[in-house]
Amino acid sequence: MQGRLSAWLVKHGLIHRSLGFDYQGIETLQIKPEDWHSIAVIFYVYGYNYLRSQCAYDVAPGGLLASVYHLTRIEDDVDQPEELCIKVFASRRNPRIPSVFWVWKSVDFQERESYDMLGISYDNHPRLKRILMPESWIGWPLRKDYIAPNFYEIQDAH
């Protein structure tokens, strides 16, 4: 089933894939990484002026990584704002997705956290560096194939 926004994207020749609707009726679209920045600008111009959240997850051990964006169209005199979910999948070997920092500034720390925990590199992000883990940390802790280092020195301290 295709939603109103998905139909609009098809009408204008913008490549995407509809992933259906969630339990609240919010449409989820899959966008290719190479198309994401230009489509993000189009969504902003279309009225999706608020990025509610961004998160990322590991789809499966050895599989793709996903970056998820929840967008909201906030307008005056509207009781229920229009919402949209975008999923951008990236290869595990070279997980690169264009940053949308220059479209929605609120994504700053969220993209940094996704980089820190999963190793997704957000191209053109102005400050893409670790935000939770020390800079010296090796690996990406939320990947399903991550092997945790031994922490004997911390255990011995007690």
UniProtKB/Swiss-Prot annotation:
MF (Gene Ontology): NADH dehydrogenase (ubiquinone) activity; quinone binding
Membrane topology per record: Peripheral membrane protein
Gene3D superfamilies in the record: NADH:ubiquinone oxidoreductase, 30kDa subunit
Pfam families noted in UniProt: Complex1_30kDa
Protein's cellular compartments: Plastid, Chloroplast thylakoid membrane
Main location (coarse class): plastid
EC number assigned by the record: 7.1.1.-
Catalytic reactions of this protein: a plastoquinone + NADH + (n+1) H(+)(in) = a plastoquinol + NAD(+) + n H(+)(out); a plastoquinone + NADPH + (n+1) H(+)(in) = a plastoquinol + NADP(+) + n H(+)(out)
Quaternary data: NDH is composed of at least 16 different subunits, 5 of which are encoded in the nucleus.
Protein name from the UniProt record: NAD(P)H-quinone oxidoreductase subunit J, chloroplastic
Lineage of producing organism: Eukaryota, Viridiplantae, Streptophyta, Embryophyta, Tracheophyta
Gene name, Swiss-Prot/TrEMBL: ndhJ
